């Protein structure tokens, strides 16, 4: 009798433990502030809030965690305090059409559709049914640094791709600068420079950079002609340390790389290594009379229903409106706007080096064409390919 009772107690205890949902965030690019169980299969908490070193920024949107012991369960998650600070003003990222992503292998992702957002209280809720025991959940499709390194390894044998420069981060991660062209063709080619993921958490930019690279290296007839006539320089991941640690927007030193291209005498911190790497490369090019004909900086941190191409207010960039119009042929919801800050990468390149520069910010989630489609990794890659086609049409005019 005693043995039977002990056996029943042991079995009950193990079943109870097995049913407890576990939240894990100790892997690459993962991030969640606090997430506590408040009822069976119900969790409440906050995302990490990252405070900029000068205290005028508070970024919070990125989350990425793993759940275990969830098979055949419905679990709900509530995140509050979803309000930050951007350049001294309020920053709101979440909406009622924000849809996180879920994966059972950390590779293939689907949207979580059961979502709600309380705009007054800044609370975001979502719930989902789990088909397997382990799942990963993220704000948007993650693009970890290791994935980028593996991708680069898979394409670097191409005769058209060359790593011409390699910057380093404070944590000694590589920042490859890629050159893509046909080296056997003419030398006086127009040069295009593209950067992505200055801001960690803007992971769709990494996939769009893959789309650019995949197309330029392909056997497509148009791609072959582009390689003959142009040379592309691409930095797919400008902020590897921030990406690795799952930071929203900033580096682990809480610097916004896009605010660091012009330094003031009163700045308390040194210019980031990530910035100095690319800046020095461009300055060296100009010293050797090698210009850049076009620069594009890719951003994508919000899940909102529009894509914007930002220009500064200088006359030199007004012509780039034509490029945004060409992008409409592929992405009808692209529009252009204006922003000005001398410390921004694109603005600095225009003002200091007279490089025609464009900031392209596209959504990580919802398309605004009225059909309610949500973007996928393939869509991000297609965006990159279509951008190259738009650039070619623009420079050929």
What function would you assign to each model-found segment?
Residues 3-13:
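Sec-dependent N-terminal signal peptides
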Residues 45, 57, 269-277, 319, ...:
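Soluble or luminal CAZymes and related metallo-dependent hydrolases
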Residues 142, 256-258, 304-311, 339-397:
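Active-site-adjacent mobile loop/cap segments within catalytic or ligand-binding domains
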Residues 162-181, 186-337, 359-361, 366-372:
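Active-site/substrate-binding loop(s) of hydrolase catalytic cores
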